[in-house]
Amino acid sequence: IEKQDHWNDHFAAAMKKAYEAHPRDIEIATIYAEAILNQTPWKMWDIWKNKVAEGAGTVKAQRVLERFVDTPEGRVHPGILHLYVHLMEMSPTPEKALMAGDRLRELVPHAGHLIHMPTHIDSQCGEYRDALHWNQKGIAADLKIAERQGRMNFYTAYRVHNYHFAIYGAMFLGQYEPAISAAEEMIREIPVELLKLESPPMADFLESYISMKTHVQIR
C-alpha cells in the first residue's frame, strides 16, 4: 500500500480540480471523496483522542459527502452512502451515518457487501439485532455470486466478512446458535486451496477467521 501513496496523492489532487470545476456533479464528488479516503485508509480518525487523525483529509471528505448525502440524489446513490458509512464508522459520532446506512442496505439487493456495510454503523451504535439480520441477508445475496463464480477468488474475503459480522452481532445478543452456525458456515466457505494461494497471499487475509468458531465456543 505504501508504494501506491504517491499515485493516490496525485489522483486525489486531480480529482480535487475536477470537483472544483464541477461541484454539483455527484459522480465526480463520489470519486473525489473516495480518493481522499484512499490517501489514509482506515486512518481518518484518531480513535484514542476522538478527533480527526493528523494528516488525514477527513474534514474535506466529510464536507464533500455531507453536501450530497441528504439530497434527493444522494439518498439513492450507493457510492455516496457507502463512502459516508466508511468515513463515519470510526468517528466519535458514528450515529450520524445511521440514516445513510438504512438507505443503503436495500438499495442494491444483489450486492452482499452493500447490504453488509451499514452494519459497521449498527455495530458501533449497539444495534446488534440489525447487525445479525442484515449480515444474514448479505450472506444469502453473496452465495449467489459464489455459486456463479466459485470460491477461488478475492471476493471470498468480502463474503467471509459478512459471516464475521453475523458472528459478532449474535455474540453481543447472547445468541449461541446463529453465532456457531455462522462460524461453521464460514469455515466451509474458505477452501484450503484458496488459503494456499500466494499471490495474493490469501492465507494472510483469511486464515485467522477460522479460529472464530473457538471464540464463539469460549464466549
Locations of the language-model features?
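Alpha-helix capping and inter-helical loop/turn segments
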Residues: 41, 92-95, 218-219
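Hydrophobic/aromatic side-chain positions at a characteristic register within alpha-helices
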Residues: 89, 123, 171, 215-218
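Short coil/linker segments at helix-helix boundaries
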Residues: 1-24, 31-75, 81-91, 100-103, ...
